[in-house]
């Protein structure tokens, strides 16, 4: 498996300079990826939160090898054209190292309801499906005429295209027993299972394999809770491991400077 550091850009790590320091330490230590949360609020009490796209741009400039990206961006609260522009620019800035993690988002910190965003899960799912489809169409560089229930692109051409072709890799979050998010992920390039045990991951991957015919070329980015689960997930075919320190962890830089397999 490849190993990625998943950084909560909050508290002391809401400073992009601190995030760059962590990312460069991780690259030097042999990590394969550096990803960041995409939240606008976090926790019930006020806390500093960095913008993920500004942070990722800084990380892209400071690093040369690691894959980078958000894990995950709630597409339901973003305009697809704005996200298309941001992702293509970041893909060029990083020389084709961007992976885009997408999901429904959560409202536990009122980062949806607090700003009048859509909260209804069904509607968020519809917006996620439409938004992902529209993103891929805009990345194509072709003139598109898209009319969905939630988004419209009226005979427009969006350039430049991403460095990566046929598209920037799309990984989708999926939680627990929900089957629709797994099938959604199977239509794209990867899955980020959230809070799953070994049996649940096996069930998810069975769905993916049934949908795709094979797991070949499909990324599975897991967050194991320890060495035993790490090995079990690897046996099931996981391709990436996320190591996610606690938000504001003062030892984050030390973790980043550690050879990742030794953490398990």
Question: PLM ranges: what are they?
Answer:
Residues 1-264:
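Active-site-adjacent structural elements that line small-molecule/cofactor binding pockets in enzymes
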């Amino acid at each position: 498996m490849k190993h990625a550091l998943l950084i909560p850009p909050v508290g002391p790590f809401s400073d992009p300079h601190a995030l760059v320091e962590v990312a460069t330490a991780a690259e030097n230590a042999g990590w394969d990826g550096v990803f960041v949360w995409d939240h606008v609020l976090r926790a019930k009490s006020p806390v500093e939160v960095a913008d993920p796209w500004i942070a990722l741009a800084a990380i892209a400039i400071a690093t040369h090898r690691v894959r980078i990206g958000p894990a995950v961006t709630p597409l339901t609260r973003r305009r697809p054209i704005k996200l298309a522009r941001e992702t293509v620019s970041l893909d060029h800035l990083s020389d084709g190292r961007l992976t885009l993690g997408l999901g429904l988002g959560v409202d536990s910190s009122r980062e949806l309801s607090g700003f009048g965003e859509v909260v209804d899960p069904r509607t968020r799912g519809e917006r996620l499906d439409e938004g992902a489809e529209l993103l891929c169409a805009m990345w194509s560089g072709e003139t598109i005429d898209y009319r969905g229930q939630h988004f419209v692109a009226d005979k427009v051409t969006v350039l430049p295209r991403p460095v990566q072709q046929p598209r920037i890799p799309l990984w989708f979050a999926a939680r627990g027993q929900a089957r629709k998010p797994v099938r959604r992920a199977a239509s794209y390039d990867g899955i980020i299972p959230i809070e799953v045990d070994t049996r649940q991951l096996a069930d998810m991957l069975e769905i993916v394999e049934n949908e795709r015919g094979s797991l070949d070329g499909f990324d599975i980015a897991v967050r194991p809770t320890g060495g035993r689960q790490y090995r079990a997930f690897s046996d099931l075919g996981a391709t990436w491991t996320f190591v996610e320190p606690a938000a504001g962890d003062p030892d984050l830089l030390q973790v980043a400077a550690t050879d990742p397999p030794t953490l398990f």
